[in-house]
Amino acid sequence: MFLKLFLLLSLVSFSHSDSSSTVSCPNGTDFHQLTTVFRYVSGFNSSWFSSNCSAVITHVVLPSRKLNGTVSWNPIRNLTRLRVLDLSNNSLDGSLPTWLWSMPGLVSVNLSRNRFGGSIRVIPVNGSVLSAVKELNLSFNRFKHAVNFTGFTNLTTLDLSHNSLGVLPLGLGSLSGLRHLDISRCKINGSVKPISGLKSLDYLDLSENSMNGSFPVDFPNLNHLQFLNLSANRFSGSVGFDKYRKFGKSAFLHGGDFVFNDSKIPYHHRIHRLPHRHPPPVRQRNVKTHRTNHTPLVIGLSSSLGALIIVIFAAAIILIRRRMKSARTKSRWAISNPTPLDFKMEKSGPFEFGTESGSSWVADIKEPTAAPVVMASKPLMNLTFKDLIVATSHFGTESVISDGTCGPLYRAVLPGDLHVAIKVLERIRDVDQNDAVTAFEALTRLKHPNLLTLSGYCIAGKEKLILYEFMANGDLHRWLHELPAGETNVEDWSADTWESHVGDSSPEKTNWLIRHRIAIGVARGLAYLHHVGTTHGHLVATNILLTETLEPRISDFGINNIARTGDDTNKNNVEFDVYSFGVILFELLTGKQGSDENVKSVRRLVKERRGEEALDSRLRLAAGESVNEMVESLRIGYFCTAETPVKRPTMQQVLGLLKDIRTVSR
């Protein structure tokens, strides 16, 4: 028993520390990288891992933890010692980066029973064109078509069952060391012959596809196989008694046009072609009765009663299973609440909280219940600062979404299953409380489809906290620069069309119409702010949140006006907002971050009438005739980023120009 417990604990490569404390590790540590990976995933709790900042993570094993959301894969690159990755049986979505398979130490990956999609192939990393992965389980997901296993030379176990591959994955025939292969229920059409050279297989499941081929000549060496399932396919061929006895009748059931040609096989098991789905009609015999005989009647009634009981029992079982399945489905697709940490609540303040950057902020109040949370969107909610502490696990690192220049941003689930983002405004600590309340109340009244309106606020001592609706799709910066191409959050799998055949990108990112719509939305929201006499002052891609339909919503507007300092004098005006929008437009069109260097480079290309060279290659490949629209949009960005502020257009003019681009092209 002790040995089993030890093996179970060893799945995580380092021991858990005391979860009663919240530790903030430097950015370069494995622990920090891991919390960043799951920052947009509901239900993740960093206390599952050691908070020892010097610990090295080799195993990430989190099966059946009710995780829900999109994994931010990029930080996993920095877990250089990672060997085992198991996120099975959760509700994670998106696609997998192609560089994942080239991580040198990664040998076992289990991502089964999630909602992952996209392509699977090895992309060279640091000169390596091969994958070290030996065991790979991607069953019960959403993978389609773009699958290539040419570089997976070390694979011994591969399970791709219950996906929608459509065709046999490329490169399977070259996996000489493969011992276990399961591609059942993958909607595969075509011949089985490409895998006939797999000589090491001892397990092969091809069931419930539409594959064809001649048995046994088109199949791998059957002498080494211990398990075989060819049922529900379109195969043909001759099955001898040795194969029948070894694999059983079920291996060939509905498998195609098989001939069982050995007299030792029972006659009723010799299936020559696909069996009928319904039994043949039973001929009724004429029965002559010369005298009354109650025995047949009793037997008939008994049989009928027995059959009725069996039918009722079977119906009850089916009903129970359907209800259980429905309950499991609802549980799986529901957004799970972050698991609260066991922490000790100080009886009296001040309360100090660490951040990812290593700094800290202090709520200098004696009682956490003394600071109310004012919810403009739900005025009847009775919340206090204590509720925010509990909802964020003591403002722990596992609840951090980001830690930017304005202050840390946390994810929380308040009573009533209200998902919110909480930002600590470090820059306005010294602003008078009454002035802050006046400003917050004014901001809660600004409502527009492209603004992320302030939901509420809390003032705890000098600390000012604001609450927004939580946006699970994250921000524009993350969507453009951090997420792997091919990501999809499409709920209807049967109609999932996000796969792309242009490189490794999805139509979400290669679609100019979507990026143009985002630009229009941001311009519309900013124009509204200027119309009501408010400026943003710090418009960047991380302050533009995306809804489930990729509709943009601007956040943090008006905050710079509260924290007016000498350094911000030139930023609290509409001209600076217009410049910032031009940078955003450049990011949307080039796919590059809006650094000063990139802005200068794009402006130079536009000025030299070489704007097409600056466009994101993913857009150019997929756009076709829309290239002219994108080049014209670059010119709008050029006007917005004019060095002389007075030469910049107004946001209302910018909005009109962006709308005209699509109107003229049509």
Curated annotation (Swiss-Prot):
Residues 1-17 form the signal peptide. Its EC number is 2.7.11.1. Residues 18-297 are extracellular. Changing K423A: Complete loss of kinase activity. GO terms for molecular function: ATP binding; calmodulin binding; protein kinase activity; protein serine kinase activity; protein serine/threonine kinase activity. Its cofactor is Mn(2+); Mg(2+). Disruption phenotype: Endosperm development arrested at one-cell zygotic stage. Increased resistance to auxin (e.g. IAA and NPA) and osmotic stress (e.g. mannitol). The keyword Transcription does not apply. Pfam families: LRR_8, PK_Tyr_Ser-Thr. Can phosphorylate the myelin basic protein in vitro. Required for endosperm development in embryos. Maybe involved in auxin and osmotic stress responses. The chain crosses the membrane at residues 298-318. Residues 395-661 form the Protein kinase domain. Calmodulin (CaM)-independent autophosphorylation. It comes from the Eukaryota. This is Calmodulin-binding receptor kinase CaMRLK. Disulfide bonds: none annotated. Glycans are attached at residues 27, 45, 52, 68, 78, 89, 110, 126, 137, 148, 154, 189, 212, 229, 261. Binds calmodulin (CaM) in a calcium-dependent manner. Interacts with CAM1, but not with CAM8. Its main location: membrane. It is a single-pass membrane protein. Residues 319-337 are annotated as: Calmodulin binding. Induction: Induced after P.brassicae oviposition.
